[in-house]
Amino acid sequence: SSNQYLRSDFRVMGLVGAAHGASHFFHLVLPPLFPILKEEFDVSYSALALLTTCFYGVSGIAQTLAGFLVDRFGARNILLGGLTLLAASVIGYGFATEFWMLLLFSLLAGLGNSVFHPADLTILTQKVTPLRLGKAYGVHAFSGNLGWATAPIFVIYASQLFNWQTALILSGLLGLFIVLFFVIFGSDLTDTKVGSKIRIDTTVFSLASLNQNL
């Protein structure tokens, strides 16, 4: 029935939106803490900026490869793998005792982040009713901006309430919770290989995302 399709569409939008929002949230967990990290690791702001450069550089370069992996292994698997790697890397930030550890986790986080646009846009294209795809893409964009907006507030408040390590660990655990939520409620969001038409679309998504990151 139309109500069933409506519920299904909004469930898919919600799940994919939560994952996309988490990815954007993780984009901004480190920069608000730079003044603290500068003192903690006795490094310059230029060195700290390198963390962001590595994150976005790896993420942008790996986007196209992620599109091919989505075609080969299915969007759901790749999305869950990427979000798990990204969340685990943010938890790793919280356990870092040397600056090189932050750098390593930034590279891994960028790799995890690279999957999102190819994977989540493919899921939306496959699972949302065509008449509601515009709304789905709008929710997708909104969720990303919501992630950006909430990250600085969360990490600063948590770092003041606890410490910077706990703030980052809690941020990563939030991402793992979304992974678990996606596994439980998104089991039908296809692991099957996509057809040739979607494969072309996925590559376009990847190239568009690469351009956005560059």
Residue locations for each model-derived region?
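Cytoplasmic helix-loop-helix junction between adjacent transmembrane helices
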Residues: 105-144
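Flexible cytoplasmic inter-helical loops of multi-pass small-molecule transporters
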Residues: 183-207
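Extracytoplasmic
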Residues: 15-35, 39-45
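Residue-level signature of mid-helix packing/kink "hotspots" within the transmembrane helices
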Residues: 28, 56-64, 148-149
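Conserved MFS/SLC helix-loop-helix module at the cytosolic interface between two early adjacent transmembrane helices
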Residues: 61-97
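Helix-loop-helix hairpin linking two adjacent transmembrane segments in secondary transporters
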Residues: 140-188
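Paired small-residue
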Residues: 89, 100-108
